[in-house]
Swiss-Prot record:
Domain notes: Contains one Leu-Xaa-Xaa-Leu-Leu (LXXLL) motif, which may be required for an association with nuclear receptors.
Location within or outside the cell: Nucleus
Zinc finger (PHD-type) stretch: 1332-1369
Designated name of the protein: Putative Polycomb group protein ASXL2
Species assigned in the record: Mus musculus
Biased composition (Gly residues): 643-652
Keywords: Metal-binding, Methylation, Nucleus, Phosphoprotein, Repressor, Transcription, Transcription regulation, Ubl conjugation pathway, Zinc, Zinc-finger
Record's compositionally biased regions (Basic and acidic residues): 398-412
Ranges spanned by the short sequence motif Nuclear localization signal, renumbered to the chain: 178-182
Residues carrying Asymmetric dimethylarginine: 594
Length: 1370
């Protein structure tokens, strides 16, 4: 019983059905009846969940289709089967044809499949099946599915829609061809050359084939080009041309020959012995695929005389190994089905097959062996003859050859060709198709044995097509030939249609040769696959595979890549997104790639939805529009500016997003930023996007939010909205949320200022209404609420720069009042800030053009941050955004970038290290600004609460840190650095003054921050530590380092930090921020602190943000923190007066604390190093940072991550207080040098406790910061630089611990000193390791930088064909 059960279980449907039919031998049964018997008698265990009837039906279809099939479909009835052995041979053939015809429509699919699977036991069956397969493929022109599956398809005289369709298709094809011809004129075979075919082929095509599209009249003759890729048939839907109606128009003998190319299933033998088309023969998937395959091969140029000659040569070469091949021939045709070579040969050789199909196949096979050598016999027929003649001619040639061999067999293919050309191209195509397909198959297989067998098969098929081909093939192997004939024809129906006509045009010999070669080639494949599947499908698959590798893969790929890549670089294109991941994951070695990456990258992270893509595209458009405004500037920004911003932002964005996502809430924040970073990066061409995005990248608390934003913005606001949208979510989620909006705004800032205005308007508009300061303030405040989402983000963006100006500056720009605070565009913002002082004045130009770039891409990132910072308190929030934006903004609208791109007076120093210096410069402007009342911004308003002076000081600090931060962010690749440089140089003194001036206020803010920080400490690292750190750092620096320190403390450090993270690192984040995402998250607090350091306002904001985010946002990215600070700070700013006051007081105490715990602060912020450095080696650090920054900024853009990391390491080391090793690689290591002083840096957590309520938490959070911090402290001239460094370090750390850290530090240090440190502060090895690993230009092709030869993605390198580093240098 058990055995029986097992048997029952293991029994196949075929076995069960066979058992049933054996039990009722002479009773043909339908599949339903068979199933009933199976179920009744329990012949097969039917598992639940299967549809027995469908399974059984499919099996019957499959196994009734080939000669090896065990079942026979009864001719005149629907789905009625009997066992083959029960059917007499004579009837068998008829019944097979008719049953196939009746089953035709549904049959063709399954039967083909199963025939390949059933591996017929008898070789003859296999041969016949191959034959049928080939023929079915060949003559399966898509005829509209005929309602009548009746065996005979009467030639309907009524014009059916299909006929109309075919006429239409022909006319259309003719039109297309004529157009094509006009373009290519005398080079119809050009397309061939583009394929894998050689020029030789092209030449042959053009020479031998006139390739005239030919009017319809001529088309009816043999004038259609069926050889060259130029053929009208390439543009024709063969299934529309070849249908039962057009087929019925052909001469009878032609029809019969063509029918032989179809699988037996698809033709029926009538009582008169004449074959007729099955109802579905030309309307099934097999014929469709055959037509498609033939068309593909035609377009590849496989049928050109040149290719045919080549194929023939290959076949001849293969002949040398023919014996060996023959030995293994069975492997392809006989082995799998259990047939021996002898059997297959016998089957092939026996031309007495009862079935017409078999006979033709066999005859050609037998003949082929005898006439194998004369493959080119067909050439005898002149091609010049009319198509009708041509049809006949091939016939004669075939007939002659056939006569030599088995005339019917070899004749059938050739006559088919002839008749096809004569009566209809369509038919001709079919026959040729099969040979060609086979040829194609043959080409594929290279193995000698395979090739030889293929040869035979091909020859057989060819013999049908051409006698000489048949002869050759026959010599090789009859059975193979037959298989090739059947199989290949199946595939070739359409493929050969085109060639047929050319063949007609060409001498028959050519046709024959073509067919032979193509058939042979296909044969080889066919042989291999014959065993696996006798059906048309395998062949098709083979054909397709071969064809595609040959034609589609080689050129189309390159062409597409070349075209798309170039045009995609400037705009954000979907392909970039796809490409970016892989491409950029190469560890982001080339920053140049980064920028372009950022272009595409922004959306790479997170969802790559249609909405994303659309938003991206819109963003790009918006950016382009924005860029259009500053054509040169935009272009420059796009190339150069973007490089810095987008490079890191874009590249990192995805990672950052990913990391952030992982991180959690904070992570989420980052993600949006990431996306935004990409967006901004995308804005490469645009300006704001990139800057804004980058900065924001970190802030985006929620990737999802970011995604929605992306999806949301239909147009320019795509990025913006994305950020804005993100902001709400992020804000709601956590203080960091504000950060998210920032990115959106930033992102939008340049290209999407209008949108930004809208988005920002929501939050910022209230501010707008108010006085700029008030606006800023309110923005900061309103951001707290819904405005925070859009307003906060807006504000931040305003502060940040281009985008921020949208909310603040931009918005203001649109609205003069806002402009005053944050000079509308990023440049204005920067200008505003810088305007106040001479350095600012200088900055305005650089800032607007260079400063902005260096700081935050014009005002957007660094400048705005700096300006914002300067303007700050209110800007502080903005600064946060802006800082983050510094980086991103710089690329797009950044004047500095523009200047750089334009080759203007933006020195490299400005671009790289100067941003830090610039920060200091900015500080002075801040003071001036304050005096002017412009630098106030919402940030100032916020600070107003504390005191204008403090605000000023803070602004100065903010500005410097922001600059530093933008610098940092730009360090990756930000032109803004030069701006900083300019400013820094000018500002060193001013910075100091500002520091002092803002000391009290800054101190107050710092006290506030300290208080808040303490509260935050308690609330954990989330954001409090960063905030506290910033406050502490700010205060600390103020007290300890007096002006410089104060500057650093006065949010400058924080801002700077943030920029490094947000701007520079944001870029990194998006590119390689992900890897550091965790770190970043870890240093969420640090980033916040850093942000705080960025500027007093920012510090407050930071504190506030930290405070708010402490609980939930600590892990948000530094950028997020920054953004949060911007948003949260804004929120605090909304509430901000109090927070500011409290922060001020807290900060003050903290300031003192910072003073006392300079190292702690540094360490806490990752600034420890900076403060310590400042104390111990302030000058040195400054110096180091200066050159580090210069180097850093230069390199970062260039190498972005890798370079940044290295430079970071070097810078850190150079600074000695680069950062604590604790956090990240080199930066941290560098810190150790200053370790004694930087112990806190080294032990950021410990120092964090000192600096923050919960230093431990902060410490980890600030590891990255620590790295930067040291640098920052080192900068004695400006505490801000140190602070910035710290903040940046945090930023860097957070994102890319080392990279960000160093940049911040560097930014800070250069602030006071010339950026001497050649090594970038950003050695972030971690960052490099983290982020460089993935480039988010997954789908981009790699191109070489014309400047340095580095490879990166098309998107990354951009239209200038220069990598980020080269762009920055230029």
């Amino acid at each position: 019983m058990r055995e029986k059960g097992r048997r029952k279980k293991g029994r196949t449907w075929a076995e069960a059905a066979k058992t049933v039919l054996e039990k009722y031998p002479n009773t043909p049964m339908s599949h339903k009846e068979i199933l009933q018997v199976i179920q009744r008698e329990g012949l097969k265990e039917i598992r639940s969940g299967t549809s027995p009837l469908a399974c059984l039906n499919a099996m019957l279809h499959t196994n009734s289709r080939g000669e090896e099939g065990i079942f026979y479909k009864v001719p005149g009835r629907m789905g009625v089967y009997t066992l083959k052995k029960d059917v007499p041979d004579g009837v068998k053939e008829l019944s097979e044809c008719s049953e196939e015809s009746s089953d035709g429509q549904s049959d063709s699919h399954s039967s083909d499949n199963s025939s390949s699977s059933d591996g017929g036991s008898n070789k003859e069956g296999r041969k016949s099946r191959w034959k049928r397969k080939v023929s079915s493929r060949l003559s399966h022109p898509p005829s509209p599915p005929s309602g009548c599956p009746s065996p005979t398809i009467p030639a309907s005289k009524v014009i059916s829609p299909s006929q109309k369709h075919s006429k239409k298709a022909l006319k259309q094809a003719l039109k297309q061809q004529q157009q094509k011809k006009k373009q290519q004129q005398c080079r119809p075979s050009m397309s061939i050359s583009n394929q894998h075919l050689s020029l030789k082929t092209v030449k042959a095509a053009s020479d031998s084939v006139p390739a005239k599209p030919g009017q319809m009249k001529r088309t009816k003759c043999a004038d259609i080009d069926v050889e060259t890729p130029d053929s009208i048939l390439v543009n024709t839907n063969l299934r529309a041309l070849i249908n039962k109606h057009t087929f019925s128009v052909l001469p009878g003998d032609c029809q019969q020959r063509l029918l032989l190319l179809l699988p037996e299933v698809d033709r029926q033998v009538g009582p008169d012995g004449l074959m007729k088309l099955n109802g579905s023969a030309l309307n099934n998937e097999f014929f469709t695929s055959a037509a498609q395959g033939w068309k593909e091969r035609l377009s590849e140029g496989e049928f050109t005389p040149e290719m045919q000659v080549r194929i023939r040569q290959e076949i001849e070469k293969e002949k040398k190994v023919e014996l060996w091949k023959e030995q293994f021939f069975e492997n392809y045709y006989g082995q799998s089905s259990g047939l021996s070579l002898e059997d297959s040969q016998k089957l092939t050789a026996s031309s007495s097959d009862p079935k017409a199909k078999k006979t033709p196949a066999e005859q050609p096979k037998s003949i082929l062996p005898s006439e194998a050598s004369p493959v080119r016999i067909v050439p005898v027929v002149p091609q010049s003859e009319c198509k009708e003649e041509a049809v006949q001619i091939p016939s004669p040639s075939q007939k002659e050859e056939n006569q030599d061999e088995a005339r019917p067999d070899s004749k059938s293919p050739e006559p088919v060709l002839a008749s096809a050309s004569n009566t209809n191209e369509l038919i001709t195509m079919k026959p040729i198709k099969s040979p060609k397909d086979e040829g194609l198959l043959e080409q594929k297989p290279v193995a000698c044995a395979e090739q030889e067998s293929e040869k035979e098969n091909h020859v057989t098929t060819t013999s049908r097509n051409n006698k000489s081909e048949n002869q050759e093939a026959l010599a090789i192997s009859p059975s193979k030939s037959k298989n090739a004939g059947l199989q290949k024809p199946i595939i070739k129906p359409v493929a050969e249609a085109s060639p047929l006509n050319p063949d007609m045009k060409m001498p028959p010999a050519t046709v024959t040769d073509q067919i032979q070669e193509s058939l042979k080639r296909k044969s080889s494949l066919t042989d291999e696959e014959a065993t696996s599947s006798w059906e048309k499908r395998p062949r098709i698959t083979e054909n397709r595979q071969h064809q595609q590798p040959f034609q589609v893969s080689p050129q189309p790929f390159l062409n597409r890549g070349d075209r798309v890549q170039v045009r995609k670089v400037p705009p954000l294109k979907i392909p970039v997104s796809r490409i970016s991941p892989m491409l950029f994951s190469t560890s982001q070695v080339s920053p140049r790639a980064r920028f372009p990456i950022s272009i595409t990258s922004p959306y790479r992270t997170g969802a790559r939805t249609l909405a994303d893509i659309k938003a991206k595209a819109q963003l790009v458009e918006a950016q382009k529009a924005a860029a259009a405004a500053a054509a040169a500037a935009a272009a420059a920004a796009s190339v150069g500016g973007t490089i810095p911003g987008p490079g890191p932002g874009g590249g990192q964005s995805p990672r950052e997003g990913g990391e952030r996502k992982i991180a959690g809430g904070g992570s989420a924040g980052s993600d949006p930023v990431s996306t935004n970073g990409k967006g901004p990066t995308l804005e490469l061409a645009g300006t704001g996007s990139r800057g804004g995005t980058r900065e924001l990248l970190p802030c985006g608390p929620q990737p999802e939010t970011n995604m929605p934003g992306q999806a949301q913005p239909p147009g320019i606001s795509g990025a913006q909205l994305q950020q804005t949208s993100s902001v709400p979510t992020g804000l709601a989620s956590s203080g960091a949320c504000t950060s998210v909006p920032l990115p959106a705004h930033i992102e939008i800032s340049n290209s999407e200022k209008p949108n930004l205005h809208k988005a920002t308007a929501t939050a910022a508009s209230p501010c707008h209404l108010q006085d700029p300061r008030s606006c800023r303030l309110e923005k900061a405040l309103s951001p707290t609420g819904p405005p925070l989402i859009s307003g906060a983000s807006t504000v931040y963006f305003v502060a940040d720069g281009t985008v921020e100006p949208k909310a603040g500056s931009n918005k203001n720009a649109p609205k003069p009042s806002a402009l005053a605070k944050t000079t509308a565009p990023a440049p204005l913002d920067m200008t505003s800030s810088p305007v106040t002082t001479a350095s600012l004045e200088k900055l305005p130009v650089p800032q607007i053009s260079g400063t902005a770039t260096s700081t935050g891409s014009a005002p957007s990132s660094s400048t705005l941050p700096a300006a914002s910072s300067l303007k700050t308190p209110g800007t502080s929030a903005n600064m946060n955004g802006p800082i983050s934006r510094t980086s991103s903004s710089i690329p797009a609208n950044n004047p500095l970038v523009t200047q750089l791109l334009q080759g203007k007076d933006v020195p490299l120093e400005q671009i790289l290290p100067k941003p830090l210096t610039k920060i200091e410069m900015k500080t002075v402007p801040l003071t001036t600004k304050e005096e002017k009342g412009i630098g106030i911004f919402p940030g100032i308003s916020v600070m107003e609460s504390s005191s204008r002076e403090e605000v000023n000081g803070r602004q100065a600090h903010l500005a410097i840190p922001q600059l530093g931060k933008p610098l940092q962010s730009k360090q990756l690749s930000q032109v803004p650095r030069p701006v900083f440089t300019a400013k820094d140089r000018k500002d060193p003194c001013i910075d100091t003054h500002q520091y002092r001036e803002g000391l009290s206020k800054t101190t107050q803010d710092q006290l506030f921050q300290t208080l808040i920080q303490r509260a935050q400490r308690q609330s954990v690292l989330s954001f409090v530590p960063p905030s506290q750190f910033n406050f502490a750092h700010s205060g600390f620096h103020l007290e300890d380092i007096s002006t410089s320190q104060k500057f650093m403390l006065g949010f400058a450090g924080r801002r700077t930090s943030k920029p490094a993270m947000a701007g520079h690192y944001l870029l990194n984040i998006s590119t390689y921020g992900r890897g550091t995402e965790n770190i970043k998250r870890t240093h969420s607090v640090n980033p916040d602190d850093r942000f705080c350091l960025s500027s007093p306002t920012e510090a407050l904001r930071m504190g506030h943000a930290d405070y708010k985010n402490t609980t939930g946002e600590i892990s948000s990215k530094e950028d997020e923190s920054d953004e949060d600070r911007v948003g949260d700070e804004q929120e605090p700013i909304s509430v901000k007066e109090e927070p500011w006051a409290s922060q001020s007081s807290g900060r003050h105490p903290h300031h003192g604390e910072a003073s006392s715990t300079n190292d702690c602060l540094a360490s806490k912020n990752g600034k420890t190093e900076a403060p310590v450095s400042e104390q111990t080696t302030l000058g040195q650090e400054n110096y180091i940072f200066s050159r580090g920054q210069a180097s850093d900024e230069k390199s970062l853009p260039r190498d972005f991550i890798p370079a940044a990391h290295k430079q970071m390491t070097h810078a850190v080391r150079g600074k000695t207080v680069c950062s604590s090793p604790e956090l990240f690689n080199s930066t941290a290591l560098s810190l150790p040098a200053d370790s004694p002083t930087h112990q806190p840096l080294l032990l950021p957590p410990l120092q964090t406790p000192k600096l923050y309520g919960s230093p431990t938490q902060i410490g980890p959070s600030y590891r990255g910061m620590i790295n930067v911090s040291t640098s920052s402290d080192m900068d004695h001239n400006s505490a801000i630089p140190g602070s910035q460094v710290s903040s940046n370090v945090g930023d860097v750390m957070s994102f890319s611990v080392t990279v960000t850290t160093i940049p911040a530090s560097q930014a800070m240090n250069p602030s006071s000193h010339g950026q001497t440190i050649p090594v970038q502060t950003f050695p972030d090895d971690n960052s490099i390791e983290d982020t460089p690993s993935k480039c988010y230009c997954r789908l981009k092709a790699m191109i070489m930088c014309k400047g340095c030869g580095a490879f990166c993605h098309d998107d990354c390198i951009g239209p200038s064909k220069l990598c980020v580093s080269c762009l920055v240098v230029r």
